[in-house]
């Protein structure tokens, strides 16, 4: 496909929006899924102040803005802001006219049906796209890893899910969803840093904590042992410089924060950890295909980027699975973007071209067409 009519691939995450052209090997635009509105009255006349800012611009002016994320737990909760993000994606980031390109969007599995209908409606009615499609995120990650069978543990900023896929088909009865992901870990880190005497409260300060989390946190192979090490020596301590020059020290918080993925009780949640959720998902599948799932456990999404997470998953799942089972955790280095990469692969396949929902089909059937054409 030439640049002229290349499909646009937009992976709208709860935390980051990844967008680009089908056939590319990486997204052209990656920006925070944030809409910011001024907290104060504008007094400077003629400054061209806007009533809202999107993405990086909102991030850089965060000190004077209230930041809102229109996507929570993978579900769009604020459609007006979502439209702003899409508008920004097409016109400011990719600089394309959406009415000239087919658009591939992504969504979390087990999302409410109304959510994808509304996505479809906005694409056709507001942006006048000639064609569109909604794909499930985890399935795209598996495409990106070059497999058709495996179980994907996809964890982003807003939602984590485990999706078993066999010969290219997602097994809906075995998909499990966990509303515990990056944003919850950021909030938890804010809380445990407060216990150390560092107070982070505003929406802007939360972004600083997110940066600390991304730069310094890791998953311990053995949590209890790591806690003992942290208590007896300062070898695990790291320092971080805040935007105002103040330096803070962070110790056991570095691994206590992501430990909540394995022990959600840290957050006061009753759910199972990501290792148990993955195991339960496999156990809901037919006994004959479990072996293939254990041997192809693929990690995807930004919240799987912690150092040590693959080894820990290997250890935890080995403890749960039958003792003779071969277990392999696949953690591709580009897993932060694997959903997008999978979308880029899918949208450029010649066999996929008949799968698009066209404007004509939409006009005939309305938004519900999305349930028939996208599965």
Swiss-Prot record:
GO terms for cellular component: cytoskeleton; dense body; focal adhesion; plasma membrane. It is an enzyme of class 3 (hydrolase). The modification N-acetylaspartate is found at residue 2. The modification Methionine (R)-sulfoxide is found at residues 44, 47. One of its GO terms (molecular function) is ATP binding. The modification N-acetylmethionine is found at residue 1. Pfam families: Actin. Oxidation of Met-44 and Met-47 by MICALs (mical1, mical2 or mical3) to form methionine sulfoxide promotes actin filament depolymerization. Mical1 and mical2 produce the (R)-S-oxide form. The (R)-S-oxide form is reverted by msrb1 and msrb2, which promote actin repolymerization. Methylated at His-73 by SETD3. SUPFAM superfamilies: Actin-like ATPase domain (SSF53067). Its EC number is 3.6.4.-. Its main location: cytoplasm. Actins are highly conserved proteins that are involved in various types of cell motility and are ubiquitously expressed in all eukaryotic cells. Belongs to the actin family. Polymerization of globular actin (G-actin) leads to a structural filament (F-actin) in the form of a two-stranded helix. Each actin can bind to 4 others. In vertebrates 3 main groups of actin isoforms, alpha, beta and gamma have been identified. The alpha actins are found in muscle tissues and are a major constituent of the contractile apparatus. The beta and gamma actins coexist in most cell types as components of the cytoskeleton and as mediators of internal cell motility. This is Actin, cytoplasmic 2. The lineage of its organism: Eukaryota, Metazoa, Chordata, Craniata, Vertebrata. The gene is actg1.
């Amino acid at each position: 496909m030439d640049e002229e009519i290349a499909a646009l691939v937009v992976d709208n995450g709860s935390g980051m929006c990844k967008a680009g052209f089908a056939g590319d090997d990486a997204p052209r635009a990656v920006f925070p899924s944030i809409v910011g509105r001024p907290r104060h009255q504008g007094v400077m006349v003629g400054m061209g102040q806007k009533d809202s800012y999107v993405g990086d611009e909102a991030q850089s002016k965060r000190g004077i803005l209230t930041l809102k994320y229109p996507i929570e737990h993978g579900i769009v909760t604020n459609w007006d802001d979502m439209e702003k993000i899409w508008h920004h994606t097409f016109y400011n980031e990719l600089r394309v006219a959406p009415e000239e390109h087919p658009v591939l969007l992504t969504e979390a599995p087990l999302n409410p049906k109304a959510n994808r209908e509304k996505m479809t409606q906005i694409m056709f009615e507001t942006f006048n796209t000639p064609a569109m499609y909604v794909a499930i995120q985890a399935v795209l990650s598996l495409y990106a890893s070059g497999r058709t069978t495996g179980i994907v543990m996809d964890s982003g900023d807003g939602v984590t899910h485990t999706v078993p896929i066999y010969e290219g088909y997602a097994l809906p009865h075995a998909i499990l969803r966990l509303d515990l992901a990056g944003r919850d870990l950021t909030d938890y880190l804010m809380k445990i840093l407060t216990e150390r005497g560092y107070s982070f409260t505003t929406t802007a300060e939360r972004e600083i904590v997110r940066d600390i989390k991304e730069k310094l946190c890791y998953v311990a192979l053995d949590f209890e042992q790591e806690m003992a090490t942290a208590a007896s020596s300062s070898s695990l301590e790291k320092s971080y410089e805040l935007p105002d020059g103040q330096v803070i020290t962070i110790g056991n918080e570095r691994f206590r924060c992501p430990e909540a993925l394995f022990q959600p009780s840290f957050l006061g949640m009753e759910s199972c950890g990501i290792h148990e959720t993955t195991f339960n998902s496999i156990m809901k599948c037919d006994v004959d295909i479990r072996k293939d799932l254990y041997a192809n456990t693929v990690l995807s999404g930004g919240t799987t980027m912690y150092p040590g997470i693959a080894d820990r998953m290997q250890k935890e799942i080995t403890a749960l699975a039958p003792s003779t089972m071969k277990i392999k955790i696949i953690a591709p280095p580009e897993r932060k973007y694997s959903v997008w990469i999978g979308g880029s692969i899918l949208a450029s396949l010649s066999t996929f071209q008949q799968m698009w929902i066209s404007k004509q089909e939409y006009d005939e059937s309305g938004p519900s067409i999305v349930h028939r054409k996208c599965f």
